[in-house]
Design a protein with these regions (language model features):
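Secreted/periplasmic carbohydrate-active enzymes, especially glycoside hydrolases
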Residues: 1-319
Length: 319
């Protein structure tokens, strides 16, 4: 009998609109012991993936969750099932809608693995040199990020209310899965700083963060050389810090963060970027309102140089 141990389950968001969208669950074929498949695919060897998705759930609003079963998609690379969700709700800070996905793997009708996952529909994306949010009806609005480096646990102490009221994004270095879960449920948006010692751990961290609705984007820092192909199929914007504006940006970067002190020498650099540019500064602040004000001051101070995709207030300078 073919054995399988803790197969990785991938959840995929299909194209969406306000009427319906599809969600796919997939078990990677590399998780099966190929020598036990006797040249067959996992599906031909009588493995199946099934389950259901329920939701939306939201702590800030009353919802009427629906339950939709996943339908097997037949033979192919790995195991794949799909469910069509009516009236999908995208995750936002104001309305942090989540879905529960229950998945089970069976062999010859016998359950071999069972797991539950949190799923969210993303409503933000990059277009040209800005971030945008959609209402799922095909309407997009430009979203200027106003980010502050702040302890996430403190931001969540009041259920994220102050961060939501001020429209702030919380900059967090290597957030834990528990923190991401709480931020997703409570509506606190995170800009994650990914700082890992090697390529493998960096890519793994980005992929783990990409499943959380609260993580709007990741910024990779440190001396790791990543190929653009390493981040294929990652459903989240990935950017970099710019230490030297005279150097080329990595091919994988979809946006960048530039220190305000470099702007006077970076006009040509900024004008030449076909991607969002976020300006950062190091300033103290006492609370969320003061942090939001610091973002406004930074925006005003650099208005002559350009209209940027976002403004970050840091408490330390993370390279």
């Amino acid at each position: 009998m073919t054995e399988v141990t803790n197969l990785e389950i991938e959840m995929i968001q299909g194209p969406f609109n306000s009427i319906s969208t599809q969600v796919f669950v997939r078990a990677n074929p590399t998780g099966f012991a190929e020598d036990n498949l006797a040249g067959q695919s996992a599906w031909q060897a009588d493995w199946r993936i099934a389950g259901q998705i329920s939701g939306p759930y939201c702590v800030h609003s009353e919802t009427l969750p629906a339950v939709i079963a996943f339908q097997d998609q037949g033979d192919g690379a790995g195991l794949l099932a799909a469910a069509r969700i009516p009236d999908p709700c995208a995750w936002t800070a104001r309305l942090p809608a989540t879905y529960k996905v229950d998945v089970e793997l069976t062999h010859a009708g016998q359950r071999r693995q069972q797991s539950q996952h949190l799923f969210t529909f993303r409503a933000n994306e990059i277009r040209q040199n800005s971030f945008y949010q959609t209402d799922l009806n095909g309407n997009y609005r430009r979203w200027v990020l106003r980010c502050v480096q702040h302890p996430l646990d403190d931001a969540l102490s009041d259920g994220g209310e102050q961060f939501r009221e001020e429209g702030l994004v919380c900059i967090v270095i290597n957030p834990t899965m528990e923190q991401c879960n709480l931020a997703t449920l409570n509506g606190v948006v995170i800009l994650s700083i990914v700082q890992q010692p090697d390529i493998e751990k960096t890519i793994s961290a980005v992929k783990e963060l990409a499943v959380w609705g609260c993580v709007t984007a990741c910024v990779i820092v440190g001396d790791v050389e990543i190929k653009d192909t390493d981040l294929n199929n990652v459903r989240i914007p990935v950017g970099c810090r710019v230490a030297d504006v005279s150097e080329s940006l990595p091919a994988w970067a979809q946006f960048c963060i530039v220190d305000v002190a470099s702007l006077s020498n970076a006009s040509a650099f900024v004008d030449g970027q076909q991607m969002p540019v976020i300006v950062s500064d190091i300033q103290p602040f006492e609370d969320c309102r003061a942090a939001r004000n610091q973002c406004a001051v930074l925006q005003k101070n650099v208005a002559a140089e350009g209209d940027y995709a976002g403004y970050c207030i840091l408490t330390t300078n993370k390279d």
